[in-house]
Amino acid sequence: MTKVTPTSLADLIRRPIVTEKATLLLENNQYVFEVDPRATKPQIKAAIEELFEVKVTGISTSNMPIKKKRIGKFIGHKAQYKRATVTLAPEFTINLFPEV
């Protein structure tokens, strides 16, 4: 198992992904995050449990493909990223939308 230092845990989780599908997954106590492409499932689990103080029961990851992006006559691409869907134990939640 890979040793992860607490200072690098925050670097593994980049941001939560808030899309229509990700919002529907919240009902099943599943949360979607963009993570570092080199992160492994045990590292992601350790990072989520440490940062949010929750119990993770499952993780599925997928590498999202590079998509072409055109702006005028210039053709480029969107960066590739890794998406992690994290399932929490029923008694835990993550507050992604804090009260204002």
Swiss-Prot record:
Pfam family, one: Ribosomal_L23
One GO MF term: rRNA binding
Alphabetical UniProt keywords: Ribonucleoprotein, Ribosomal protein, RNA-binding, rRNA-binding
GO cellular component, one term: ribosome
InterPro entries: Nucleotide-bd_a/b_plait_sf, Ribosomal_uL23-like, Ribosomal_uL23/eL15/eS24_sf, Ribosomal_uL23_CS
GO biological process: translation
Superkingdom of the source species: Bacteria
PROSITE patterns: RIBOSOMAL_L23
Subunit text: Part of the 50S ribosomal subunit. Contacts protein L29, and trigger factor when it is bound to the ribosome.
Family to which the UniProt record says this protein belongs: Belongs to the universal ribosomal protein uL23 family.
Main function: One of the early assembly proteins it binds 23S rRNA. One of the proteins that surrounds the polypeptide exit tunnel on the outside of the ribosome. Forms the main docking site for trigger factor binding to the ribosome.
Protein name according to UniProt: Large ribosomal subunit protein uL23
UniProt organism field: Acaryochloris marina (strain MBIC 11017)
Gene expressing this chain: rplW
